[in-house]
C-alpha cells in the first residue's frame, strides 16, 4: 500500500488530544474536532478566529443554495445545489490593552485541545501572554445538544495569573459568512435584534429561499453594549479579571430553519429561545453526558491488547474505532426523513454536502444493526425523493427512476456528466438497501407501502438503460462508469451488470410476493404506476440473460478490455503525489489498470454468500494489488475480504488504515472534512471482518477471526428486537442475548441457538 500514516494526535482510548499547536495541521485539526448532532454541525475552528489557516464553518442539515450551469447537451444538468455555511455562532473577540487574541500572531503556550468521546465535548486550553506581559489562562468549551438538536453551547473561561484588570469580550451571531469554494456569501437581508443578554438574527438564502434563525443567550459579566448592523449582531462587555478568580462567559444557542418550523420562523425562534433559557449550560452538559453514556453502553466496541508489547498499536485501533462510532452517531440518528448522509457529513464543504450511493452500500449496515429505525428513515429519504429520480430518468431518455450520484434534496447535483450520466450504482444501491433492510427486519409493511414502488421504478430504468449485444447474445450496460472512477465510458462493467441483474430480479420477485400477500395494495400500486402486465417478465428475461464478464476459473473482468490495459505498480507512486486528482493530469488516471476503489470486490462483498471462497480468493488476489485506495471506502472492503480469506496480516493493515483514515490523514485530505461514509465501513470492518458476520444469507452467519495482537474483542448488535452481545478471544467466541427471544444463527457453518445464557463456540 503506497500510502502512509501522518501521525499528529495523541492516542487515548476515549479522547483525541492535540498537544501543542502546529499551524500546518490547522485545517486537519478543525476536521477532526468537528461536532454535530444530525441537525447542526461545526468544525473545530478557533472561536476567536485570527490569522490561522482555517475553514470556519457551522452547518445546518438541509440548508443549501443553488446556481445555474451552462448546459451544452441534453441529459447534462443545468443547475446544481450545494451546502453553504450557516450562521456563525462561535463568533468571539477578546482584547487586552488594545491587543486582540489571535493565535496566528499572539504569544501563547501550554496549548492543548481535547475531543472527549465519552462526553461529546470539545475543550481547548492555553496560556496567553500579552505584549504588555499580562498572562491569562483561557479555556474554551463547546458541545452540540444531542437531545434538543436545535441547541448548541459555548463556554469561555478566563483567569488572570499576574494582574488585575479588564478584558474586553465581544460575542456575536453573524450571517456574513462566505462559502470558501465559491468565495461568496449566500445569505440575503438579515433581520436582527439584540438586548444585553440576547442576540437574534434571521436570514434567507439567495436562490433556494431557505430561512434560518439563530439566537443566543449570553452571560457576559458586567455591563454590555449591543451592536446590530447588516448581517451581524454582537454584545460587548469589559470583564474584570483578578488572580485566582475564574470568570465564565456562557453562550446558549438556538438554530432553526424553515424546513423544521411553520411559516413564521421568527416567532418559532423566539419560542425556542424562551424554552432554552430555562436550561443552564451545566444542566445541558449533564444531559449530554447521560446521552453519550447510554450510547456507549449499547454501541461500544472494546479491543484489548494481547500483551504489553501490543498495547500501543491496539490503543490506536481502539481510539480509531471509537472515533468512527462517535462521528457516525453525531452525523445521523434517523431524526428526519428529509436528510441523507453527506460524504463529509457536516464537517466541511468538500463534496458540497452531497450524499452518494455510499449511504445504502456502506452506511446502512451500521444502522441496520444499531438503529434499524434510522436505517428505515434513510430509505424513506429515497422514497420522498422518488419524483426527482423519475424526472432524472426522463432527462436520460429512459423510463423509471434514476437516483442521483450526488444530492442534498433528491435532484442530481453533480455537474460532471461522466459521473452523473454514466454511474448507475445509486439506483442499484437503493434496490440493494431495500433488499438488505427487508431481509434483516422482515418489514413487509415498508416493502409494500414504499419499497415496491421504488424497486419497480428502478427496474424500469435498468430495463431501458440496458443494451443487447448481438455479438454475444447477452444484455449488458454500455457507456458506464462503475465504482472504480478511474475508468469511464466502459462497456459491461461487472459491478453494474451484476447489480442491475439483482435489482431487476428482486423487483419482479417482490411484485410476485405482493400480488399473493397483499393483492389490494398490489392492485393500487399497479394502477398508480401503470404497470404493464408483461414488464416483470421482461425484467426476469433481462436478468436471466445478463452478461457478467468472467474467466473459466471465475475471475471477473472489471469491464470489457480491462485485462489488456497497461499495468501500474502502485507501490512506486510517491506519497507526495496523493491525492492523485490534485497532482496528476485528469486523463492520466484512466490509462492503466490502476483502480481507485473496489469494483469487482464490491459486489463480492455486498452479495458475499452468493460466491464461494475460491472465487473470492482469485478475485481478491488479482484486484487488491491494483487498488490505490483513493476512495476512503476502499480499505475496509479489502480488510473484510482479507479476513474471510485468512489473510490476517493484510486484514489488520487495512483495518488500521480504515479506522484511522482521518486521524492519521492517510489520504492527505482530512483538511477538507471527515470521510463520514467510510467511517461507517470502519464499523463494518470489525463486525463483518473480524467477527465474520454475513447478513445476506437465510440466517445470520458468523466466522470470528481475532487479530493476533488482540486479546479480546467485545461488541453488540441489534437484530429483530434482540440485542446480541459478542465477546471474542483467541480460543472462543461467546454469544449472549441481552434482549429478546432465542435466535438461531450459524457459527463456522454450524447452527447455534442463542439465549439469555452465554454460549461459547470454539475457534475454528
Question: Residue locations for each model-derived region?
Answer:
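C-terminal capping/lid segments that line or modulate ligand- or cofactor-binding pockets
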Residues: 25-53, 57-59, 362, 409-410, ...
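Active-site core of glycosidic bond-cleaving carbohydrate-active enzymes
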Residues: 355-384, 512, 525-671
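Helix-terminus loop motifs that line ligand-binding clefts
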Residues: 332-347, 373-432, 438, 444-449, ...
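Structural helix-adjacent loops and short alpha-helical linkers that scaffold large soluble proteins
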Residues: 305-318, 335-336, 369-379, 438-453, ...
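The feature captures the catalytic groove of carbohydrate-active enzymes
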Residues: 257, 347-355, 401-449, 460-540
Amino acid at each position: 500500500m503506497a500510502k502512509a500514516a501522518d501521525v499528529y494526535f495523541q492516542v487515548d482510548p476515549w479522547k483525541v488530544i492535540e498537544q501543542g499547536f502546529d499551524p500546518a495541521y490547522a485545517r486537519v485539526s478543525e476536521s477532526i474536532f468537528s461536532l454535530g448532532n444530525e441537525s447542526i454541525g461545526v468544525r473545530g475552528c478557533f472561536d476567536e478566529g485570527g490569522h490561522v489557516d482555517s475553514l470556519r464553518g457551522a452547518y445546518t442539515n438541509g440548508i443549501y443554495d443553488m446556481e445555474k450551469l451552462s448546459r451544452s447537451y441534453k441529459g447534462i444538468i443545468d443547475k446544481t445545489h450545494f451546502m453553504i455555511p450557516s450562521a456563525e455562532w462561535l463568533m468571539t473577540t477578546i482584547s487586552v490593552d488594545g491587543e486582540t487574541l489571535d493565535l496566528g500572531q499572539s504569544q501563547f503556550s501550554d496549548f492543548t485541545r481535547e475531543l472527549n468521546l465519552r462526553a461529546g465535548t470539545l475543550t481547548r486550553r492555553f496560556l496567553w501572554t500579552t505584549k504588555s506581559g499580562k498572562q491569562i489562562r483561557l479555556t474554551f468549551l463547546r458541545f452540540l445538544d444531542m437531545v434538543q438538536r436545535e441547541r448548541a453551547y459555548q463556554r469561555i473561561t478566563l483567569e488572570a495569573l499576574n494582574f488585575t484588570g479588564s478584558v474586553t469580550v465581544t460575542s456575536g451571531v453573524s450571517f456574513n459568512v462566505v462559502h470558501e469554494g465559491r468565495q461568496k456569501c449566500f445569505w440575503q437581508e438579515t433581520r436582527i435584534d439584540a438586548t444585553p443578554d440576547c442576540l437574534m438574527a434571521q436570514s434567507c438564502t439567495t436562490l433556494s429561499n431557505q430561512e434560518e434563525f439563530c439566537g443566543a443567550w449570553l452571560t457576559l459579566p458586567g455591563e454590555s453594549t449591543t451592536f446590530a448592523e447588516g448581517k451581524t449582531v454582537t454584545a460587548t462587555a469589559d470583564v474584570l479579571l483578578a488572580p485566582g478568580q475564574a470568570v465564565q462567559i456562557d453562550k446558549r444557542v438556538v438554530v432553526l430553519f424553515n424546513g423544521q418550523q411553520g411559516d413564521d420562523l421568527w416567532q418559532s425562534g423566539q419560542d425556542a429561545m424562551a424554552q432554552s433559557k430555562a436550561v443552564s449550560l451545566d444542566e445541558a452538559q449533564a444531559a449530554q453526558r447521560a446521552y453519550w453514556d447510554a450510547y456507549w453502553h449499547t454501541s461500544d466496541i472494546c479491543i484489548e491488547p494481547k500483551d504489553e508489547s501490543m498495547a500501543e498499536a491496539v490503543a490506536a485501533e481502539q481510539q480509531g474505532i471509537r472515533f468512527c462510532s462517535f462521528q457516525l452517531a453525531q452525523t445521523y440518528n434517523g431524526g428526519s426523513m428529509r436528510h441523507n448522509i453527506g460524504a463529509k457529513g457536516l464537517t466541511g464543504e468538500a463534496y458540497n454536502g452531497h450524499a452518494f450511493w455510499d449511504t445504502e452500500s456502506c452506511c446502512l449496515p451500521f444502522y441496520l444493526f444499531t438503529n434499524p429505525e434510522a436505517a428505515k428513515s434513510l430509505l424513506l429519504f429515497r422514497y420522498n425523493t422518488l419524483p426527482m429520480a423519475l424526472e432524472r430518468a426522463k432527462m436520460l431518455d429512459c423510463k423509471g427512476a434514476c437516483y442521483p450520484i450526488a444530492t442534498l434534496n433528491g435532484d442530481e447535483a453533480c455537474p460532471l456528466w461522466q459521473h452523473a450520466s454514466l454511474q448507475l450504482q445509486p439506483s442499484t444501491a437503493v434496490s440493494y438497501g431495500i433488499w438488505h433492510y427487508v431481509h434483516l427486519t422482515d418489514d413487509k409493511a415498508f416493502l409494500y407501502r414504499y419499497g415496491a414502488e421504488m424497486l419497480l421504478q428502478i427496474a424500469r430504468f435498468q430495463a431501458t438503460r440496458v443494451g443487447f449485444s448481438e455479438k454475444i447474445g447477452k444484455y449488458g450496460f454500455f457507456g458506464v462508469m462503475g465504482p472504480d472512477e478511474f475508468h469511464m465510458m466502459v462497456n459491461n462493467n461487472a459491478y453494474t451488470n451484476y447489480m442491475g441483474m439483482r435489482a431487476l430480479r428482486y423487483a419482479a420477485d417482490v411484485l410476485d410476493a405482493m400480488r399473493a400477500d397483499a393483492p389490494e395494495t398490489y392492485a393500487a400500486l399497479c394502477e398508480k404506476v401503470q404497470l404493464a402486465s408483461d414488464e416483470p417478465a421482461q425484467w426476469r428475461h433481462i436478468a436471466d440473460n445478463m452478461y457478467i464478464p468472467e474467466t473459466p476459473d471465475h475471475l471477473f473482468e472489471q469491464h470489457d478490455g480491462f485485462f489488456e490495459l497497461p499495468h501500474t505498480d502502485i507501490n512506486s507512486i510517491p506519497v507526495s503525489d496523493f491525492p492523485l486528482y490534485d497532482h496528476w493530469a485528469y486523463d492520466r488516471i484512466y490509462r492503466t489498470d490502476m483502480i481507485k476503489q473496489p469494483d469487482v470486490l464490491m459486489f463480492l462483498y455486498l452479495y458475499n454468500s452468493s460466491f464461494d471462497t475460491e472465487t473470492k480468493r482469485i478475485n481478491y488476489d488479482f484486484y487488491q494489488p491494483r487498488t490505490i485506495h483513493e476512495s476512503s471506502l476502499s480499505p475496509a472492503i479489502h480488510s473484510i475480504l482479507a479476513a474471510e480469506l485468512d489473510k490476517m496480516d493484510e486484514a489488520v493493515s487495512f483495518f488500521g488504515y480504515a479506522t484511522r483514515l482521518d486521524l492519521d490523514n492517510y489520504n492527505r485530505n482530512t483538511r477538507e472534512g471527515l470521510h463520514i461514509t467510510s467511517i461507517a465501513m470502519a464499523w463494518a470492518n470489525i463486525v463483518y471482518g473480524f467477527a465474520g458476520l454475513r447478513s445476506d444469507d437465510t440466517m445470520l452467519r458468523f466466522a470470528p477471526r481475532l487479530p493476533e495482537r488482540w486479546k479480546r474483542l467485545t461488541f453488540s448488535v441489534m437484530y429483530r428486537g434482540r440485542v446480541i452481545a459478542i465477546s471474542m478471544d483467541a480460543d472462543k467466541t461467546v454469544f449472549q442475548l441481552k434482549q429478546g427471544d432465542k435466535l438461531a444463527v450459524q457459527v463456522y457453518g454450524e447452527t447455534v441457538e442463542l439465549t439469555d445464557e452465554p454460549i461459547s463456540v470454539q475457534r475454528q
